[in-house]
C-alpha cells in the first residue's frame, strides 16, 4: 500500500514530492537530494516512541535514559566501557551548531554519577576549539608543564591520604588538557583537508556550522575518538514565525543538513571506517501529522507540534542491516501500529553493537547497580546485519 506523505497538512504536502529511491525503494523527500545517495546504507526506525513531550526532559531521556537530571549520558557510558584509543584526545567529544545549546543543557553530555573523566568535552568549530585551553600571555609550554607537574604532585599526595577517585580524575584532566593544547587545534583545523572534501561536505572554514561539525566528526573518528556527538539547534518548526515554518525555515534546515550528512556516510565508507563506526540520527521526539495553529486565526505560517507517539530515527554503519525499514504508523503517521521501539530499545541496540550486554553493563551508585536502560530495553534485532 502506498504510505507516502501524510495527508494531515493538506496543501503544504501537495507542494512536496516524495520518491522511492535506491535498491531498497525507501521514500525520500525531494528536499533531501543528497540523502538519496545513502538511502541504501541506512536502517529506518519508523515507530520510535517516547513518553516525554517537552524539549528539556525529552532530550535528557534520549541521552541519559531518564527524564530526570543526574544520570550519565550515553557518551559517558560508552567512554566508561570502552575507554579512549587516543591518549592525546578526549574519548567523548561534543560539537554544537544552530546558534543555541540543547534545551537540556550540558546534562546531555554530562557524566552524572560516573567519574568526571567520562564527561563529554565541548569543542567549537569557530575560535578556540576548547574554551580556556590556550595559555595566558607569559606562560609557555615549559612553564605550563612544570605547573601541572607541581599541581599533580600535590594531588597525588591528596589521593594517597584520602583515596578519592575524583582526585585521580583531576590529575588525568590536567594532563589531558596539556596534551590537548597541541592535539585539538590540529584535529579541529579543516583547512588541511583537500578542496574536494570541502566541496563534498559544503564546509566553510572559520564558521560554526553543522557541515563543519560533520567533517570534524570524521576527523575525530579517524584519530580514535570513541564517541562524537553532534547537536544542531533550530528544528522546532511550530510555525509561529517564518523561521519556524515548514515552508521556509524548516526547508532551510533540510538543505543545511542534507549534503553534510550524506558526505559523512560516504566519506566514512570510502575510508573503510563505516563498517567500524555506528552513526545514529534523530531527535528527542517527532512532530504531529496535522498542522499546528499556534498563533490563531489568520496565521500565515505552517507548523507542527511535538509528538512523542511516533517518529523516525535511522542508523547506519557497523552491524546495521542496510536499506531496511522497521516499524509502521497508522495512515496519518500519528501513532505506531507495528514494530514500536522505545528510547530504551535504541540504547540497548547501540550498546549491543558496541559490544555490551545492556543488562549487565552497570555502575554501582548509592548502594545499587544502575544501567543506561534502567529496567527496560530490548535489542532491535530486526535491523542488525
Regions found by a protein language model. Give the residues of each.
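Ligand-binding pockets and gating/stacking loops
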Residues: 1, 7-385
Amino acid at each position: 500500500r502506498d504510505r507516502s506523505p501524510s495527508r494531515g497538512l493538506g496543501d503544504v504536502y501537495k507542494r512536496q514530492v516524495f520518491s522511492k529511491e535506491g535498491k531498497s525503494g525507501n521514500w525520500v523527500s525531494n528536499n533531501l537530494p543528497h540523502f538519496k545517495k545513502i538511502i541504501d546504507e541506512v536502517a529506518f526506525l519508523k515507530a520510535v516512541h517516547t513518553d516525554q513531550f517537552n524539549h528539556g526532559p525529552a532530550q535528557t531521556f534520549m541521552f541519559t535514559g531518564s527524564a530526570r537530571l543526574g544520570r550519565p549520558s550515553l557518551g559517558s557510558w560508552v567512554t566508561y566501557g570502552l575507554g579512549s584509543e587516543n591518549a592525546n584526545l578526549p574519548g567523548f567529544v561534543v560539537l554544537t551548531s544552530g546558534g543555541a545549546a540543547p534545551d537540556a543543557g550540558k546534562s546531555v553530555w554530562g557524566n552524572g554519577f560516573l567519574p568526571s573523566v567520562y564527561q563529554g568535552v565541548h569543542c567549537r568549530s569557530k575560535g578556540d576549539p576548547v574554551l580556556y585551553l590556550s595559555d595566558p600571555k607569559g606562560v609557555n609550554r615549559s612553564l605550563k608543564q612544570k605547573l601541572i607537574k607541581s599541581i599533580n604532585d600535590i594531588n597525588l599526595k591528596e589521593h594517597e591520604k584520602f583515596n578519592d577517585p575524583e582526585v585521580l580524575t583531576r590529575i588525568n584532566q590536567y594532563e589531558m588538557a596539556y596534551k590537548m593544547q597541541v592535539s585539538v587545534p590540529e584535529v579541529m583545523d579543516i583547512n588541511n583537508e583537500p578542496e574536494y572534501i570541502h566541496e563534498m561536505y559544503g564546509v566553510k572554514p572559520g564558521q560554526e556550522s553543522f557541515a563543519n561539525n560533520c567533517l570534524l566528526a570524521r576527523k575525530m573518528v579517524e584519530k580514535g575518538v570513541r564517541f562524537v556527538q553532534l547537536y544542531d539547534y533550530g528544528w522546532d518548526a511550530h510555525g509561529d514565525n517564518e523561521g519556524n515554518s515548514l515552508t521556509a525555515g524548516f526547508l532551510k534546515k533540510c538543505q543545511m543538513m542534507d549534503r553534510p550528512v550524506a558526505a559523512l556516510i560516504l566519506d566514512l565508507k570510502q575510508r573503510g571506517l563505516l563498517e567500524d563506526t555506528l552513526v545514529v540520527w534523530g531527535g528527542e521526539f517527532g512532530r504531529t501529522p496535522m498542522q499546528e495553529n499556534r498563533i490563531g486565526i489568520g496565521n500565515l505560517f505552517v507548523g507542527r507540534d511535538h509528538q512523542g507517539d511516533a517518529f523516525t530515527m535511522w542508523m547506519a554503519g557497523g552491524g546495521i542491516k542496510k536499506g531496511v525499514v522497521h516499524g509502521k504508523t497508522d495512515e496519518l503517521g500519528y501513532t505506531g501500529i507495528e514494530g514500536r521501539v522505545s528510547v530504551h530499545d535504541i540504547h540497548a541496540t547501540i550498546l549491543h553493537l558496541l559490544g555490551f550486554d545492556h543488562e549487565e553493563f552497570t555502575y554501582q551508585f548509592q548502594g545499587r547497580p544502575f544501567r543506561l536502560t534502567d529496567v527496560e530495553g530490548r535489542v532491535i534485532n530486526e535491523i542488525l546485519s
